[in-house]
Amino acid sequence: LAAEVKGCLLISHNRIEIMWVSDRVTVLRKGKCIGTVETANTTAEGLSAMRVGRNVSFHVEKGPLKPGGEVLSVEHRTVASKVHKNNAVKKVSFQVRRGEIVCIAGIDGNGQTELVYGLTGLEPLVSGELFLCGQDITHTSIRKRSTMGMSHIPEDRHKHGLVLDYSLEDNMVLQRYFEPEFTDKAGFLRRKNIRGYAERLIEQYDVRSGQGPVTMAHSMSGGNQQKAIVAREIDKDPELLVAVQPTRGLDVGAIEYIHRQLVAQRDEGKAVLLVTLELDEVMDVPDRIL
């Protein structure tokens, strides 16, 4: 279109796309115009600093790899596709150990979603076995997998990560509301405890919301919705963290934050399974790539 002498307005926060496509960039932050620069006269790092108000590191700092025992074992697993009425994943086997980040990479639509659905219990397996910390979880429920030490940052935060019409504090205890800390013996929610727990996570994980724990999830930005999910899943102190496209649609500041949280889990001796389509993420974050 530009070659045909037509004007194009591109709205994006993908730094690669911006640097590749645009001729001139205007940066907005918190509703204000920060500045306009010629793309040829700036860098991705410079644009990122304008966008978030500070320097952002694109390099993921990790300590030396010290893998421990096996946490997740997937043996000859087959998962069906509801869309194509065939097996999207056929006889897949792999393991994830403590203290490492393992990445499943590939072009979208090649079985990653079905693989994760089978792993987390969202869809049943056609065949194969799953073991978490040596225990067979092949046919266990989603709640059971969660209480056994599996956390899941889902691909679609609106469909599987949050209840958008719930408050932030209610979303923070979606998988733990039945615990004695949050529900009394008569079955009533301990609202004071839930509020205190949510306030702690909001502060600890820098989740920004207009009304704190009573903020409705649908009113939050995508980045802060994702931070809330990350806070909830990591605070469960999981043995295995399954993170599926955890930085999709996020700005560079939120991406940096998510990467640091994944690496922190790895450095604490947790097992992390990362599923992503982002090439930079594939090359920078994991210790092994499948």
State what each model feature region is:
Residues 1-290:
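Glycine-rich phosphate-binding loops of nucleotide-dependent enzymes
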